[in-house]
């Protein structure tokens, strides 16, 4: 097999789909899922081609974010990364205690998390932490896709 061809994986609670492709681009996704994921929330690693895929909405994968943030903490001793991780853990804990009925009403804890995130995204990061600055810029662009699962599937 060509070493440049890699496996691409899509997974749900019921099935795993594996495709082989040279890239992770939109064409690869469209070749395998012409209609996108119109009845699903697409959870992914923030790759641009995934955002171009049709779905109910998108959710940035928390595990991917935490892995990056752990690296920033270890490599840069970044207090910004630590604060971002704390917000993610608060969101995870909030999701655990919410019932389906809770999503029909305003959730003050979620609003507080979004406010904390907004302040954190405005916080200046030292320029020598280039990767952390890039991460902050990416999250600022896609912040609306961070807490989707604490909103319920309909957003």
Model-derived features with residue positions:
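Catalytic center-proximal scaffold of phosphoryl-transfer enzymes
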Residues: 1-155
């Amino acid at each position: 097999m060509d070493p440049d061809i890699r496996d691409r994986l899509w997974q749900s609670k019921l099935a795993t789909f594996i495709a082989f492709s040279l890239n992770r681009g939109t064409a690869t996704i469209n070749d395998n899922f012409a209609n996108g994921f119109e009845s699903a929330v697409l959870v992914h690693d923030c790759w641009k081609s995934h955002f171009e895929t049709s779905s109910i909405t998108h959710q940035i994968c928390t595990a991917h974010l935490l892995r990056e943030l752990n690296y920033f903490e270890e490599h840069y001793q970044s207090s910004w990364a630590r604060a971002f991780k704390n917000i993610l853990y608060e969101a995870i804990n909030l999701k655990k205690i919410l019932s389906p009925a809770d999503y029909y009403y305003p959730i003050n804890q979620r609003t507080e998390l979004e406010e904390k995130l907004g302040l954190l995204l405005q916080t200046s990061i030292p320029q020598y932490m280039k990767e952390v600055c890039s991460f902050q810029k990416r999250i600022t662009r896609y912040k609306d896709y961070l807490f989707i699962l604490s909103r319920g599937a309909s957003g």
